[in-house]
Regions:
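N-terminal glycine-rich dinucleotide-binding loop that anchors FAD/FMN and/or NAD(P) in oxidoreductases
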Residues: 45-57
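Rossmann-like NAD(P)-binding element
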Residues: 54-102, 107-113
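Conserved catalytic-site region of short-chain dehydrogenase/reductase
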Residues: 110, 149-153
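NAD(P)+-binding Rossmann beta1-loop-alpha1 motif at the extreme N-terminus of oxidoreductases
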Residues: 1-46
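Rossmann-fold dehydrogenase core element
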Residues: 121-147
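Short beta-strand and adjoining strand-loop segment in the mid-core
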Residues: 115-124, 129, 157-174
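Short beta->alpha connector loops
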Residues: 80-84, 148-150, 172-173
Length: 174
C-alpha cells in the first residue's frame, strides 16, 4: 500500500513515516520536492541504524505534494490547520477516488515555549469538517484521527505509543 504524507517533512510526518514504513511504501510530500527527498533519505538512514532495521519491508521516498496526492492509496494531511483550504484546493481534483484521506490536524499555535492547543470555539469548524468541505468534488473516505498522539513519542521509534486515540469517519456519498 502507498501511504502519502503531505507535510511529510514535519515532525508528525516523520513519526508516521518511521512507524509505517515497516510494511508500506511511504511517500513524503512537500512543496519542495528536494526537501522531501532529503528527509526521506534521512529517515531511511535512521531506520537502518535502529534495532528495527531487519523488520522493515517498506521504503520511504519523497516527492512534491501534487505527485504524492495523485499516487497515494491513503493520504495523510499532516499540515497546519490554517493551511487546510489552500492545500486541499491544490489536491482536490487529483486524488484517486479510492484514496482514503486521513486528517490528524489539530489547531495549534507556537510561542517561545513550544506548541499549544487552540481551544475549539463556537462557530469554528473542526479540521476534519474543513478537510471534507475543501475536497468538495471528492467522494472520498475522510477520517479524522491521531489527534492525541505526541509528536515526540511518534518520532521516537524506540518509544511505545501508550495513548488512546479516537477516529471519526467523515464521508460523503458512500
Amino acid at each position: 500500500m502507498k501511504v502519502g504524507i503531505i507535510g511529510g517533512t514535519g515532525g508528525m510526518g516523520e513519526g508516521f513515516a518511521l512507524r509505517w514504513c515497516a510494511n508500506h511504501e511511504i511517500i513524503l510530500g512537500s512543496r519542495d520536492k528536494q526537501k522531501a527527498q532529503t528527509a526521506s533519505e534521512n529517515h531511511m538512514k535512521n531506520i537502518k541504524n535502529s534495532k528495527y532495521a531487519d523488520k522493515v519491508k517498506g521504503i520511504i521516498r519523497g516527492n512534491d505534494n501534487l505527485s504524492v496526492a495523485k499516487e497515494s492509496d491513503v493520504l495523510i494531511l499532516s499540515i497546519p490547520y490554517e493551511n487546510i483550504q489552500s492545500t486541499c484546493g491544490e489536491i482536490a481534483n487529483i486524488i484517486d477516488d479510492n484514496c482514503i484521506v486521513v486528517s490528524p490536524i489539530v489547531p495549534m499555535s507556537r510561542n517561545q515555549d513550544g506548541f499549544y492547543y487552540i481551544p475549539f470555539q463556537e462557530g469554528k469548524k473542526s479540521a476534519g469538517t474543513l478537510v471534507a468541505e475543501n475536497l468538495p468534488k471528492c467522494n472520498k473516505i475522510i477520517v479524522s484521527a491521531f489527534h492525541t498522539i505526541s509528536e515526540i513519542k511518534l518520532k521516537n521509534i524506540e518509544a511505545t505509543l501508550d495513548a488512546d486515540t479516537l477516529f471519526a469517519l467523515i464521508t460523503k456519498n458512500l
